Amino acid sequence: MPPLSESEFLALATRELDRIEAAVEAAADAADADIEISRTGNVMELEFENGSKIIINSQAPMQELWVAARAGGFHFRRDGERWIDTRNGGELYAALSGYVSEQAGASLSFH
């Protein structure tokens, strides 16, 4: 798949962050978990009741979404319609479900 222009990637990343925000809100509501979501540009911060955070941001030069969680730092690259971890091949939403569940202390899943 050919690389996108920077503006194409930023538009794609913004749409994906919108999807992630909606998915986290829906999963948190379903699990009755308190997760504060804030966004500044292409940086999203999820803050949990225990004070821990997950940061998700886009990296246009690398054409990746980066996730920083208690579990570590992860880079996801677009593969068709999915975002895949560049190290272990895991899918973004499956990975986020695990990171968010761990930090929220409740089982949350989203797609």
Curated annotation (Swiss-Prot):
Signal peptide: none annotated. PANTHER family: FRATAXIN, FRATAXIN, MITOCHONDRIAL. It comes from Cupriavidus taiwanensis (strain DSM 17343 / BCRC 17206 / CCUG 44338 / CIP 107171 / LMG 19424 / R1). It holds the Pfam family Frataxin_Cyay. GO terms for biological process: iron-sulfur cluster assembly. Involved in iron-sulfur (Fe-S) cluster assembly. May act as a regulator of Fe-S biogenesis. GO terms for cellular component: cytosol. One of its GO terms (molecular function) is ferrous iron binding. The gene is cyaY. NCBIfam families: FeS_CyaY. This is Iron-sulfur cluster assembly protein CyaY. The keyword Iron applies. Keywords: Iron, Metal-binding. Gene3D superfamilies: Frataxin/CyaY. Belongs to the frataxin family.
